[in-house]
Amino acid sequence: MATPVRTRFAPSPTGLLHVGGVRTALFSWLYARHNGGRFVLRIEDTDETREHPEAIEQIQRSLRWVGLEWDEGPGAGGDFGPYIQSERRERHREVAEQFLAQGLAYRCYCTPEELAAEREAAQRENRPFIYSRRCLALSAEERAAREAAGESSVIRLRTPDEGACVVDDLVRGQVRFEYGQLGDHVIVRSDGVPTYNFANPIDDADMHITHVIRGEDLLSSTPRQVLVYQGLGAPVPSFAHLPLLFGPDRKRLSKRHGATSVEELREAGYLAEAVVN
């Protein structure tokens, strides 16, 4: 029996919903409807410094205005909630501890100054910055001593030493990412907040998302997220990275091109049918 199609739209509540976001939501909604699947709305509020409390309501209002009703999510409920990412924080911590116990991740105690020195060295040597893994080599006793001293730490995901992640993108075709060029990225910040590339795939896996449809600016995040799916032992969804929207000057659509949010288009008198056509 085929796995039911489940897509999602996962905006961040950092402002008004951009027309590019609605375009992404439209593709996800259409794919779910075409395949008799379910369309999920999830709010990804991991960046607390950029969030606007009223943005969640504005996002929902904009989606409803253009006719994109969600089957699961805020206001609709569902079997795999909560659908607000910050309300799933305990689940993210649970997975982080699981990854630490399995050796898939490790604590890094490097200071901002030490990391800056590594970046400067990479720049002088004309090579991309990749974290040196100095904290990966710490013994259990050294880690315990640092913890006892109250040293701040982040959690990094351990990337395989060799090989590559090959993504069969539904839009771009096969894309290859060499593990040696990725580095061990941070999955939990020093304040305990999970990063986007950690929380996002955990939530997708828990919500049984089968198809991730999003902008091509997130393509480079994919190999890091695939490692999280693999660490969870969860199926890796199919990915489709859409071309971004550009203005007449061939630059990414922004305020300088005029109204770019759904709210602004609605207030300017545009019909919802014109926006999604």
Predicted features, each with a name:
Residues 76-79, 207, 259:
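Short glycine-enriched loop/turn motifs at secondary-structure junctions
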Residues 257, 261-277:
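A conserved active-site cap/scaffold subdomain adjacent to cofactor or substrate pockets
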Residues 97-100, 253-259:
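Short, surface-exposed amphipathic charged segments that create phosphate/polyanion-binding patches used
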Residues 83, 212, 265:
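Second-shell loop/turn segments in exported
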Residues 2-124, 220-234, 249, 274:
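N-terminal Rossmann-like or analogous alpha/beta NTP/dinucleotide-binding catalytic cores
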Residues 106-107, 111-241, 246-253, 261:
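Active-site cores that bind ATP or allylic diphosphates and position pyrophosphate for catalysis
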Residues 13, 19, 65, 101, ...:
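Short glycine/serine/threonine-biased micro-segments
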